Regions:
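ATP-dependent carboxylate activation and anion-phosphoryl transfer catalytic cores
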Residues: 1-63, 68-74, 78-82, 96, ...
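Short alpha-helical "recognition helix" segments of helix-turn-helix
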Residues: 37-38, 87-89
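Iron-sulfur-cluster electron-transfer modules
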Residues: 79, 85, 91, 130
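ATP-binding N-terminal substructure of ATP-dependent carboxylate-amine bond-forming enzymes
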Residues: 101-106, 110-273, 282-289, 507-649, ...
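Conserved A3 ("GATE") glycine/threonine-rich loop of ANL adenylate-forming enzymes
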Residues: 259-262, 305-309
Length: 658
């Protein structure tokens, strides 16, 4: 709320219009407007406005001091108001650790309190704990030994969801089986990891370096496991190590070598592992020179970000300038790398666990969609159905080389792109990925259980290779919430958009694929299909699928360009006018009247969020709950599947029946 550089050119307008930034506008306003005027504009209760003014006044009081002359009473008051060490350091103009050591020397440390679950009617003895500076003593003692802290995944958002919570919970359960006292730090009441019976102590507090270090110094555990909760705990690795906290598993230096785009790209060059041409961002002129030398499109990749935040595909100099500005803002402390974006390539992932630098167990999953769709939004298949044996062999070889070079001890994930006989590495995460629960369920082999045992130094025998010989197929499909996000363009890109996922098994890919799609809300098309298949290349690639739809008895409707192409290739279709043409028969009318059962709309470029006809069609399809396909490879596999199975032919079987 304070200690930031957010300002508003029209403050009263910002106060009068509720947005996710209005609380910052209120903080700015309490120093410029009276409370009654702010209340009139926001309708926020005056009690809250006075409390916000107290916080703003504290920031001003802090700014009148330096770290060396800061009064202890003022520092204690700031901590009781909720100021973090970082906020105080920004106000004083000094370092975060300087503030930390200053307050510790003054005896200003948080106390551990139990959350009262009994409404203060009786003393509550719970393992729900939190930190506060408004206390005089701890509610618990810290004499227990053999403790391990697991950092959770934090709040659910796009990119961090229940998959990482599954990893955290399974790590805790394995630690308990091994005889350790388990401590979980997490602050999301939606998670299973914050259930009272999962761990020995639950610290319901934020996942920041300050909080983790405070709890670590209170508890004095054997160490921290940060590799299960996704990107948020992973980002704390170097800070924890630099402060002297024991990070269990893969070393923080290795984590940094993988997360830092420049370091990882340099490592791949050193190992002789192929990767797309790349360059670290220095300035716009150099970026444009690189893009023009390798040819557009290019991919912009910030470091240490969640779910591909600010990752973009630029098609020209104008887009490059816009996206670089966004990426630099999101990833200020770390480098932004530009690389050649390889079109029409397959994306494949390696989820693995390593034991002291040696590959211990792995799973190779294939994306249905070509590269350019974020792995969290992609439809994933295990075992791979269309990946060459030589490609998987080379992926394993590269995985072993990277595991050795980074001395990985625990879970990791590598993303590859393959085109023809060429395999290139695009990313590596030295933590559990969101597909670990999926591969564990498909193989019926808990990768997190194995990873946790290896992290704790348990000597594990090799896994029997028969575990990986499957006579069924698993498919993981993404769940989107575009209906809840007004105006969002429901098209897939390199930045993640899905909010959930479903995995299904089948005796064949097509069966598992259809079951997964039905589970996330798709419906079998009954009669009418609209085709808008994008640029000429896409039209040509989709032609066999259009013929198959016709042969299956579907009525084909199409936009003018697609219809002309189909007619030239002897496929009849009825033309529907574009939304902006305002003539009947119009696509919007057909959608609104429920006359279309499926819409296949292939965008003309990777990223264009403008109010075009294509966008209007996609948005209207989502708003009227008409199944929508925006990816060419997905459309092809979907048509293959409905040609092979009717809905009545899909088997309903339990997971343990496979």
């Amino acid at each position: 709320m304070v200690c930031n550089d957010i300002t508003f050119p029209d403050l009263e307008r910002e106060l009068n219009n509720p947005t996710d930034l209005r609380v910052f506008a209120v903080a700015e306003a309490v120093g410029k407007l009276d409370i009654d005027r702010i209340h009139e504009l926001t309708q926020i209760d005056r009690w809250f406005l006075h409390k916000i003014r107290n916080i703003v006044n504290m920031e001003k009081d802090l700014q009148g001091h330096s770290c060396s002359d800061l009064p202890e009473d003022l520092l204690r008051s700031a901590k009781r108001l909720g100021f973090s060490d970082k906020q105080i350091s920004l106000s004083l103009g000094c370092g975060k650790l300087e503030v930390r050591e200053r307050r510790k020397a003054a005896g200003i440390v948080p106390f551990v309190k139990q959350i009262d679950t009994l409404g203060a009617e009786y003393p509550a003895q719970t393992n729900y704990l939190y930190l506060t500076y408004s206390g005089e003593e701890d509610d618990i003692d810290f004499s227990d030994s053999n403790k391990v802290i697991v950092l959770g995944s934090g709040s659910y958002r796009i990119g961090s969801s229940v998959e990482f919570d599954w990893c955290c919970v399974n790590a805790v359960l394995t630690l308990r089986d091994l005889g350790y006292r388990t401590l979980m730090i997490n602050y999301n009441p939606e998670t299973v990891s914050t259930d009272y019976d999962i761990c020995d102590k639950l610290y319901f507090d934020e996942l920041s370096f300050e909080t983790v270090a405070d709890i670590y110094e209170k508890e004095n555990p054997r160490g921290l496991i940060i590799s299960m909760g996704g990107q948020i705990p992973n980002n704390l690795a170097m800070k924890c190590m630099d402060y002297g906290l024991n990070v269990l598993g893969t070393s923080p230096e290795s984590i940094d070598s993988a997360e830092n785009r420049h370091k990882f790209s340099a490592l791949l060059d050193e190992l002789g592992v192929d990767q797309p041409d790349w360059k670290e961002l220095t300035d716009l002129d150099e970026a444009q020179a690189f893009a023009n030398s390798v040819g557009y499109p290019v991919l912009i990749r910030p470091s240490y970000v969640l779910s591909g935040a600010a990752m973009s595909v630029a098609l020209n100099d104008g887009e490059l300038k816009s996206y670089l500005s966004k990426a630099s803002e999101v990833s200020r402390e770390y480098p932004v790398v530009i690389s050649k974006f390889i079109e029409n390539a397959k994306e494949i992932e390696l989820d693995a666990v390593a034991k002291n630098g040696e590959l211990f167990v792995y799973a190779i999953t294939e994306h249905v969609e070509n590269a350019g769709v974020h792995s969290g939004d992609a439809t994933m298949v295990l075992p791979p159905q269309r990946t060459y044996l030589e490609t998987t062999r080379r992926m394993k070889k590269i995985g072993r080389e990277i595991a050795r070079a980074l001395e990985i001890n625990g879970p990791f994930n590598i993303q590859f792109i393959a085109k023809g006989n060429t395999v290139k590495v695009i990313e590596c995460n030295l933590r559990a990925s969101r597909s670990f629960p999926f591969v564990s369920k498909i193989f019926k082999l808990n990768f997190i259980d194995l990873a946790t045992k290896l992290i704790m130094g348990i000597d594990m025998p090799p896994i029997d290779k028969s575990c990986f010989e499957l006579d069924y197929v698993g498919v993981k499909a993404p769940q989107f919430s575009f209906t809840r996000i007004k105006g969002a363009d429901p098209v897939l890109s390199v930045e993640m958009a899905s909010t959930g996922e479903v995995a299904c098994l089948g005796d064949s890919f097509e069966e598992a694929f259809l079951l997964a799609l039905l589970s996330v809300g798709y419906e079998y098309p009954k009669k009418n299909v609209l085709l808008s298949t994008g640029p000429f290349e896409s039209k040509a690639l989709f032609l066999p699928d259009a013929k198959r739809l016709r042969d299956l008895g579907f009525n084909l409707y199409a936009t003018r360009g697609t219809s002309d192409f189909l007619k030239y290739n002897h496929i009849s279709s009825q033309i529907l006018n574009w939304p902006l043409e305002k003539r009947e028969p119009n696509i919007l009318t057909f959608i609104e009247e429920g006359k279309l059962d499926l819409i296949i709309n292939i965008p003309k470029s990777h990223e264009e969020v403008e109010l075009t006809n294509d966008y209007i069609i996609r948005r209207k399809a989502v708003d009227f709950n008409v199944p929508l396909i925006t990816n060419l490879q997905f459309a092809e596999r979907f048509i293959d599947a409905i040609a092979r199975y009717s809905q009545d032919e899909l088997a309903v079987k339990a997971w343990d029946e496979y």
